[in-house]
A protein has these predicted regions:
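Sec-dependent signal peptide recognition
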Residues: 2-7
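C-terminal motif of bacterial Sec signal peptides marking the signal peptidase cleavage site
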Residues: 13-16
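Cystatin/cathelin-like cysteine-protease inhibitor module
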Residues: 18-127
Length: 127
């Protein structure tokens, strides 16, 4: 009897782990309506010094078949140290269920053919 009770408790506990999982593929691929604020927030963790960014540009979210996820490409030039800038960089922000999931460094296929527009908000980040 104790084993059955223990198994029931464990099943209920593990059942709660999947509580916030997306219901379907359409939920997983929800359009990232707040993609700019999500990217700005993530850049604070991604960059050692998020201030003084130059030449920032961004693409609109595009559903890429290779990943089956929405992708937003970002170009920018960040500080290398207090006196120098690094080379221009391009990264891809991957979205899952309409929320930022991760960055991909040196994207090739993910950013092929996208159109970039100015992203002044990224250039105004504070520490």
């Amino acid at each position: 009897m104790q084993r059955i009770s223990l198994l029931l408790v464990m099943a209920l506990a593990l059942g709660g782990c999947g509580h916030n999982a997306p219901d379907s593929d359409s939920d997983i691929n929800a359009y990232p309506a707040n993609y700019k604020p999500d990217i700005l927030a993530a850049m604070h963790a991604y960059l050692n010094d998020p201030t003084g960014i130059r030449d920032a540009s961004i693409s609109e979210p595009v559903l890429k078949s290779s990943l089956s996820r929405y992708v937003v490409c970002v170009r920018f030039t960040a500080k290398k140290n207090a006196k120098e800038y690094a080379a221009p960089k391009e990264i891809a922000a991957i979205f899952l269920a309409g929320r930022f999931d991760r960055f991909i460094d040196m994207p090739k296929d993910e950013c092929a053919g996208v159109t970039f527009t100015a992203f002044p908000e990224l250039q105004k980040l504070t520490p």
